[in-house]
């Protein structure tokens, strides 16, 4: 199958599975989305959604977050990984929003990525989901799917993002980002995945990437002493020698 045909078929399947894919992080506006995405680093969206109601009840604006002591922010997000660092970043980025952007989340990659704790992926999510700007956020999960389906041979998320942007139309990037997140969780997980029943891997994943079993370099060669069905004589020989040695020792 030509790659263009594969891309079109994948897009059709994702549209059928998730015609209205929702942002998995609970938020109300660009600022709360930015906060939620910062908190999601090395953490599941489910856990983030468990702590943000309490945090946002106390600070849902840059002004309120900047006033809240770092220790209080950390207490609200204590169950998340990297909580001390994330708390400091939330306080610092809120202060920068007030000082440099009039208390508003900026609508540019350069300004977003200059904020504490905000990398390219976080900025991409905010740009496309909060402002509708062209962006294709790629995390390790989307990177895995792209490799599994033979859409990218990128060595990292940046290279995979580049490849996916070339394959899919710009107008679909934001939708595809969400569809891929949901599809990976529900149909194409990293572990315990059966490619035979996956709506995409079942036909679109190269055998070496689908997780299907296949021959390996460790397979025995025909005629070798380790061929299937032929037991290695070494363990039996060692056992016999040990038995003879014990017999001689008892006879002494």
Enumerate the language-model features and the residues they cover.
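Catalytic cores of DNA base-excision repair glycosylases
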Residues: 2-218
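Polybasic, lysine-enriched low-complexity intrinsically disordered terminal tails
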Residues: 1, 205-252
């Amino acid at each position: 199958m030509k790659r263009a045909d594969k891309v079109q078929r994948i897009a059709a399947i994702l549209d059928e599975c998730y015609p209205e894919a929702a942002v998995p992080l609970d938020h109300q506006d660009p600022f709360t989305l930015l906060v939620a995405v910062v908190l999601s680093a090395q953490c599941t969206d489910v856990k983030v959604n468990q702590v943000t109601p309490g945090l946002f009840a106390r600070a849902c604006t840059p002004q309120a977050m900047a006033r809240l002591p770092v220790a209080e922010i950390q207490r609200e997000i204590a169950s998340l990984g990297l909580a001390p660092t994330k708390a400091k970043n939330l306080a610092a980025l809120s202060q920068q929003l007030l000082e440099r952007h009039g208390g508003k989340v900026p609508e540019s990659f350069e300004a977003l990525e200059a904020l504490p704790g905000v990398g390219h992926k976080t900025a991409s999510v905010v740009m496309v989901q909060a402002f509708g700007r062209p962006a294709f956020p790629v995390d390790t999960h989307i990177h895995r799917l792209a490799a599994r389906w033979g859409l990218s041979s990128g060595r990292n998320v940046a290279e995979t993002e580049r490849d996916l942007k070339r394959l899919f139309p710009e107008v679909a990037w934001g939708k595809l980002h969400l569809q891929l997140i949901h599809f990976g969780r529900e149909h194409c997980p990293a572990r315990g995945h059966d490619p035979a029943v996956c709506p995409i891997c079942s036909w679109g994943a190269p055998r070496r990437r689908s997780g299907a079993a296949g021959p390996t370099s460790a397979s025995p060669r025909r005629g070798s002493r380790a061929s299937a069905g032929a037991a290695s004589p070494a363990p039996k020989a060692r056992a016999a020698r040990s038995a003879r040695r014990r017999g001689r020792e008892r006879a002494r």
